[in-house]
From Swiss-Prot:
The modification Phosphoserine is found at S334, S757, S761. Residues 37-66, 254-271, 334-349, 489-504, 702-722 have a biased composition (Polar residues). Disulfide bonds: none annotated. The lineage of its organism: Eukaryota, Fungi, Dikarya, Ascomycota, Saccharomycotina. The gene is BCK2. One of its GO terms (biological process) is positive regulation of gene expression. It comes from Saccharomyces cerevisiae (strain ATCC 204508 / S288c) (Baker's yeast). This is Protein BCK2.
């Protein structure tokens, strides 16, 4: 019966108190919780023998779950049929909880009386039952079951019985040691709970209120507790109350000094007790002090009770001993006082049914609050999370205009709007899913333009924005779990740009948000609707087809001073959002505005002063933005570096300087401005051969039948033959001014080859150019594999001396930008070569390709 021995530990303690033949089956904390006890032997030999015999054969055969029930039932049967019956009923009631059972010996016939009254401990030792019965009477018979239940919940109940017994009749020393220790367990549950419930009853009032009241009312108590010589005790108590109060107060002070926190802590020990004693305090400071001394001991034990019941016994016995000399003649009452207060503490504790050993252990194991990953209602209701949400809202409302906003900065909004990340601000950048951070941008259309923070002004009802609003045009491929709660900003934009047509993206494509340009880009970062690097750029600066050009403020050049930036911080911050190069082949073309802005972004990285606009050419081939002739090219281009950004590198090149061959497979089909960028990486000798050759070669696939004549014009002049139906291929050419020959050496032959390869093409030269330089034009045809050689362009007709005059040691990489007209049915290209003022160190070649 090792199992029973564990269970019977408290029973052994009880047996020490009351030595009765009958054993009581008491429920301890959940069965898994066992107190280690030296083979606790049941005080009743009959019980022990019967239980031993019954439990020993039964336990090995029985399952752990069922064993406590069977053992309990059999044991009471073996001892006494009556007691067995009552214990069976109660044990059966308990068993459903699957708790373990303790066997304790009770003494007197009173147990028989008490058994029907107290459900859990009907088997309690006769004297225990009698004492318990008395206690129950004091508390009120109606609440006996309650008491027992609570006691059952907490293993201290058994000691409660023993406690009541020593209170009734055990000597001071005995009560001080065994009775008090037992009292700690037992008294906590039954006494306190019932005191609270029946505060009006005289004894409960005594327990709950200061010791003085208890002393004065001891007459009531002796009636209930026959064992106590209450009458004798009552008079001295009442008389000595004030005197007793003083020494205890001194004692309390000394005790408090020695252990300054204990006396105060008991009062603070539990919420209920704290309130209770605070209320009592005004009645009599002396009383409370005397009480405090008792409380000090009792509470101390009670504190230990929370920590460990075994400690409670020793501490409680010490308490009773300590309190005894202070109460001198009334030593039997001092343990009672401490017990009563202990009961008060336990009562408050018992008030919370979950406060049992199991709950305490569980709370100790799980002290931390779980992180709110799911955004449950409770978590949202918590003040901290509410504050976090408010802060996030404030962030959303107060997005600083001077701050560079990026997709990464949307995390502040994601906390509020993201259906997944409802309110877990600590996990703004959760890596659970590549695009989980951007779930808020299920469709960034619903957000105001991330980079156009001017729209985030007070005029924009930011709080009204719902990130999960799905634009109606989105295909069903995007998860339909998000419902549009209101008209999103993107819808308003579409209404404004009603003339812009929108293509429904496939599952792998995402319509560039906010500005619907009529074409879709593959979301290379993820298959979800999260915009990738290109899309985020396109989102704000790709004009709709109705808008011919996109004007970009010059303030974008400074990465710190810029009012807003189209730079996608996510690409830099999150490697997951760097455009995978394996997805590049899916790109049909890159919007001109995107790469042009990327070029500018490199300039931003270089901290180039923002003094100029890139020249944008509309479908007519005319400059939509005035370009300063006095503009210094240094203001536009990074010194000794390239204009391409890492984003462009990843998008356009598989290797650093090699442009993906199929990136422009349908170069002219989307009918918008495109840009191809070759990254020279600041090489003094940039190989334009591969770049120009491959790009012209692939660009020509869509119009292999069009061998166009080439015209050259300077930006200040309009091409001789302005054909609105022809797309303008805009080229910004940059090269090493210090080493022009080396820079153009490889291309010199290729240009000639290209010029000779197109014999059927007409070449026209627009001589509206400064007299300071000659312009050479070769036949540049998209279908040829030849490379435009600036060396030939510059070297053939422009003197090297004049070139060297404006070589400033900067390496430039050409940027090809196709301006496709809406009416470009023939896919014809006009690429004027424009040389701005060479004296101003700025060269731009515009190649007009026309039939």
């Amino acid at each position: 019966m090792p199992k029973n021995s564990h269970h019977h530990r408290s029973s052994s303690v009880n047996s020490t108190k009351s030595r009765s033949t009958e054993s009581t089956n008491k429920w301890k904390i959940p069965h898994y919780y066992r107190r280690s006890a030296s083979g606790s032997t049941q005080a009743s030999p009959d019980r022990n023998s019967s239980t031993g015999s019954c439990s020993t054969p039964v336990l090995p055969t029985m399952n752990v779950m069922s064993s406590p029930k069977k053992v309990l039932l059999e044991d009471p049967r073996d001892n006494h049929t009556k007691a067995k019956k009552s214990s069976r009923k109660k044990s059966g009631e308990m068993v459903f909880v699957n708790y373990t059972v303790q066997d304790t010996a009770n003494e007197n016939d009173t147990d028989l009386q008490t058994q029907p009254v107290s459900v859990p401990a009907p088997k309690a030792k006769l004297k225990k039952k009698s004492s318990k019965r008395r206690m129950l009477k004091i508390f009120g018979s109606s609440k006996n079951e309650h008491i027992e239940d609570i006691v059952e919940e907490q293993p201290m109940v058994l000691q409660m019985d023993s406690e009541s017994k020593p209170l009734s009749g055990t000597p001071i020393s005995e009560s001080g040691i065994d009775a008090s220790s037992l009292t700690t367990k037992r008294s906590y549950n039954s006494f306190l709970k019932h005191n609270r419930l029946n505060g009006k009853t005289p004894f409960s009032g005594n327990l709950s209120f200061p010791s003085l009241n208890m002393m004065g009312n001891t007459t009531d108590l002796p009636i209930d507790n026959n064992d106590f010589c209450s009458e004798k005790e009552v008079v001295p108590k009442s008389t000595h109350d004030p005197s007793l109060a003083k020494p205890p107060s001194r004692f309390t002070e000394s005790e408090t000094n020695s252990t300054p926190n204990l006396s105060s802590i008991p009062l603070m020990n539990t919420k209920n007790t704290r309130l209770k004693y605070n209320k009592v305090a005004p009645q009599s400071s002396d009383r409370q002090k005397s009480q405090e001394s008792g409380l000090y001991h009792s509470t101390e034990s009670f504190n230990f009770k929370d920590q460990n019941y075994s400690n409670n016994k020793s501490s409680l016995s010490l308490n009773s001993d300590l309190s005894t000399p202070h109460f001198a003649k009334h030593s039997p009452d001092s343990p009672r006082t401490s017990r009563s207060f202990n009961c008060g503490d336990s009562q408050s504790k018992v008030k919370l049914p979950e406060e049992n050993d199991a709950s305490i252990a569980f709370s100790k194991m799980f002290t931390r609050k779980r992180a709110n990953t799911g955004g449950s209602t409770c978590s949202l209701a918590s003040p901290t999370i509410a504050q976090t949400i408010q802060q996030s809202n404030i962030k959303v409302n107060k997005l600083p205009t001077q701050r560079t906003t990026s997709v990464g900065s949307l995390s502040s909004m994601s906390n509020r709007y993201s259906p997944i990340r409802v309110a877990s601000p600590g996990r703004a950048r959760s890596a659970t899913r590549g695009s989980s951070l951007y779930r808020l941008s299920r469709d960034l259309n619903s957000l105001p333009s991330v980079t156009d923070l001017p729209e985030m002004d007070s005029t924009t009802p930011v709080n009204e924005i719902f990130l999960d609003g799905q634009p109606q045009h989105k295909s069903g491929s995007v998860k339909g779990g998000h419902r549009k709660k209101q008209e999103s900003i993107s819808d308003a934009q579409r209404i404004q740009h009603s003339n812009s047509y929108i293509t429904t993206p496939s599952s792998s494509l995402v319509t560039p948000p906010y500005y619907m340009t009529g074409y879709t880009l593959p979301s290379s970062a993820s298959a979800s609707s999260t915009p990738n690097v290109l899309e985020t750029h396109n989102m704000n600066f790709v004009p709709s087809t109705s808008t011919v050009t996109s004007y970009r403020p010059s303030s974008n050049f400074s990465s710190f001073d810029k009012e807003y930036s189209n730079e996608n911080d996510a690409s830099g911050e999150f490697s997951a959002f760097n455009t995978p190069m394996e997805n590049i082949p899916a790109l049909k073309g890159i919007p001109r505005s995107t790469l042009e802005e990327n070029e500018e972004e490199d300039v931003l990285v270089q901290d180039i002063p923002n003094t100029a606009h890139f020249q944008r050419r509309d479908i007519m081939g005319m400059d939509t933005h005035r370009k300063d002739d006095s503009l210094d090219f240094n203001s536009l281009m990074p010194h000794g570096s390239t204009t391409s950004s890492s984003i462009v590198d990843s998008v356009m090149t598989n290797s650093i300087s090699t442009t993906t061959s199929n990136a422009t497979g349908n170069y002219f089909q989307d009918q918008d401005k495109y840009t191809l960028v070759n990254t020279g990486l600041g090489l003094s000798d940039a190989n334009l051969d591969h770049f120009i050759r491959s790009q012209w070669k692939h660009a020509s696939r869509s119009e292999s039948n069009n061998n166009t004549g080439n015209r050259v014009s300077y930006s200040g002049s309009t091409p001789n033959n302005v054909d609105t139906t022809k797309t303008n291929l805009q080229v910004y050419t940059e090269f090493d001014f210090e080493n022009p020959e080396s820079f153009f050496h490889e291309q010199s032959k290729l240009l000639g080859e290209m010029g000779h390869s197109n014999n059927n093409s007409n070449s026209a030269i627009n001589m509206n150019e400064p007299k300071s330089a000659d312009t050479y034009i070769g036949n540049i045809s998209p279908d040829t594999s030849a490379t435009v050689s600036l060396g030939d362009l510059m070297g053939s007709n422009v003197s090297n001396n004049s070139e060297r005059n404006f070589y400033d040691g900067h390496t430039f990489v050409p940027q090809y930008q196709a301006n496709s007209s809406v009416e470009n049915s023939n896919n014809q290209n006009a690429a004027p070569i424009a040389n701005n003022d060479i004296d101003n160190n700025l060269q731009s070649f515009y190649f007009d390709n026309s039939n």
